[in-house]
Every structure is written in structure tokens, then in C-alpha cells.
């Protein structure tokens, strides 16, 4: 296997909140910054060195959408290596969360917009493969429908 030169000498570890409300809608945010600029993802970001994982999760959710959440558990771990010249390597931990309030206040420096989206509308949103994979775990009936 040929050796690939990555931009950073370490793996970037990130945490993402899959926030599902009592109406079974998921909170999606349209990114205003790379990576995934312009695509719909769930709130999250990099874990700072020395920062506990769940503290990072709460911090990122508050920074991006102004919500407090209750963490329900780990959904999955996903690996992403950027296909472009940046050659970044990410390991992303996805946690299912329940919002303590649904009043979203998005941070325009990171998020162009935020929306509560019903599972039957998810196919209409442009999102990275990792996001679709995780949403298929949260809403397995959607994944079966998308496979047809």
C-alpha cells in the first residue's frame, strides 16, 4: 500500500450530537465553514486536548445551536478521511441526545441555518455519507426505504 502524506500528524477526534426531540425530529445544521461547507450535518466539533468527551459534546451543541441536551448514549463511531488535498483524518463519536428545549439559536459563524427535520424529509437534504449512515441507525425504517 502506498504511503499517504496527511496534513496533520494526528487523528482529529470529534463529537457529534444526534438531537432527537419528542416528535421524533432530528436537528440538522447547514455548515457555513469547512469541512462539509453548505451540507446538512448535526451539531458537533473537535474535542480539545484534555477535554472530557461529554463536556466537549455539551460545549459544541451550546456553541452551534444554543441548546442544552441530555445525553442518551453512544450511537456509533465513524471514521472519515477527506478525499481532497487536505488529507485530514477524523474519528467522530456520535451520541444520541434529547433537547431540554427546542428553541434553537444558531451561531452564524459556524452554522448557516438550523432546522428540526422529520425523518420522512431527510432524503431531501444534502449531507455527508457519515451523517446518512448515522441517521440510518437512528431511524432504521428510513434506511430500509432509502435502499429501494
Where are these regions (language model features)?
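Acidic, metal-coordinating catalytic segment for phosphate/diphosphate chemistry
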Residues: 1-16
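Short, well-ordered beta-strand micro-motif
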Residues: 19, 94-98, 118
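A conserved beta-turn-beta hairpin within the catalytic core of GNAT-like acetyltransferases
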Residues: 35-39
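The catalytic Nudix box helix
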Residues: 42-74
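Active-site-adjacent beta-strand/loop module that shapes the phosphate/pyrophosphate-binding cleft
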Residues: 79-103, 138
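NUDIX/MutT-family hydrolases
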Residues: 106-137
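Charged phosphate-binding loop/patch that engages nucleotide di/tri-phosphates or the phosphate backbone
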Residues: 132-148
Amino acid at each position: 500500500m502506498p504511503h499517504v502524506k496527511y496534513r496533520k500528524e494526528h487523528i482529529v477526534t470529534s463529537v457529534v450530537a444526534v438531537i432527537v426531540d419528542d416528535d421524533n425530529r432530528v436537528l440538522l445544521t447547514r455548515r457555513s465553514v469547512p469541512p462539509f461547507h453548505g451540507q446538512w450535518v448535526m451539531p458537533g466539533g473537535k474535542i480539545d486536548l484534555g477535554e472530557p468527551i461529554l463536556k466537549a459534546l455539551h460545549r459544541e451543541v451550546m456553541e452551534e445551536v444554543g441548546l442544552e441536551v441530555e445525553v442518551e448514549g453512544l450511537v456509533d463511531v465513524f471514521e472519515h478521511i477527506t478525499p481532497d488535498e487536505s488529507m485530514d483524518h477524523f474519528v467522530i463519536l456520535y451520541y444520541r441526545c434529547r433537547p431540554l428545549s427546542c428553541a434553537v439559536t444558531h451561531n452564524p459563524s459556524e452554522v448557516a441555518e438550523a432546522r428540526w427535520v422529520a425523518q420522512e424529509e431527510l432524503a431531501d437534504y444534502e449531507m455527508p455519507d457519515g451523517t446518512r449512515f448515522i441517521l440510518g441507525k437512528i431511524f432504521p425504517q428510513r434506511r430500509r426505504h432509502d435502499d429501494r
